[in-house]
Amino acid sequence: MSISLTEAAANRVRSFLANRGKGEGLRLGVRTSGCSGMAYVLEFADVINDEDTVFEDKGVKVIIDGKSMVYLDGTELDFVKEGLNEGFKFNNPNVANECGCGESFTV
């Protein structure tokens, strides 16, 4: 089981954490949402819970709750710039289908 970050994503997360001045790392998860069933959750983690799984890649701690791990295993988190837009992109090998707007997915 693993989660990885591209260099661009790791640099962006390290920058956000440094500007924030606190935090254990980046928490990734999934929640029920959208027309395809699930959506990604990405937030800073100030604490690591007992049921969390922690990965470290490129100097960044990535924290996943136990229920989300099955949906995120093998995912690579990237940070991309496309024209005037920029943001995190999940490259998830478990995704079977995405909705038309790209906001939710099924496995």
UniProtKB/Swiss-Prot annotation:
<dbReference type="GO" id="GO:0051537">
    <property type="term" value="F:2 iron, 2 sulfur cluster binding"/>
</dbReference>
<keyword id="KW-0479">Metal-binding</keyword>
<dbReference type="GO" id="GO:0005829">
    <property type="term" value="C:cytosol"/>
</dbReference>
<feature type="binding site">
    <location>
        <position position="35"/>
    </location>
    <ligand>
        <name>Fe cation</name>
    </ligand>
</feature>
<dbReference type="InterPro" id="IPR011302">
    <property type="entry name" value="IscA_proteobacteria"/>
</dbReference>
<comment type="subunit">
    <text>Homodimer; may form tetramers and higher multimers.</text>
</comment>
<keyword id="KW-0408">Iron</keyword>
<dbReference type="InterPro" id="IPR035903">
    <property type="entry name" value="HesB-like_dom_sf"/>
</dbReference>
<comment type="function">
    <text>Is able to transfer iron-sulfur clusters to apo-ferredoxin. Multiple cycles of [2Fe2S] cluster formation and transfer are observed, suggesting that IscA acts catalytically. Recruits intracellular free iron so as to provide iron for the assembly of transient iron-sulfur cluster in IscU in the presence of IscS, L-cysteine and the thioredoxin reductase system TrxA/TrxB.</text>
</comment>
<feature type="binding site">
    <location>
        <position position="101"/>
    </location>
    <ligand>
        <name>Fe cation</name>
    </ligand>
</feature>
<feature type="binding site">
    <location>
        <position position="99"/>
    </location>
    <ligand>
        <name>Fe cation</name>
    </ligand>
</feature>
<dbReference type="GO" id="GO:0005506">
    <property type="term" value="F:iron ion binding"/>
</dbReference>
<protein>
    <recommendedName>
        <fullName>Iron-binding protein IscA</fullName>
    </recommendedName>
</protein>
<dbReference type="InterPro" id="IPR017870">
    <property type="entry name" value="FeS_cluster_insertion_CS"/>
</dbReference>
<comment type="similarity">
    <text>Belongs to the HesB/IscA family.</text>
</comment>
<dbReference type="InterPro" id="IPR050322">
    <property type="entry name" value="Fe-S_cluster_asmbl/transfer"/>
</dbReference>
<dbReference type="InterPro" id="IPR016092">
    <property type="entry name" value="FeS_cluster_insertion"/>
</dbReference>
<dbReference type="Pfam" id="PF01521">
    <property type="entry name" value="Fe-S_biosyn"/>
</dbReference>
<dbReference type="GO" id="GO:0016226">
    <property type="term" value="P:iron-sulfur cluster assembly"/>
</dbReference>
<dbReference type="InterPro" id="IPR000361">
    <property type="entry name" value="FeS_biogenesis"/>
</dbReference>
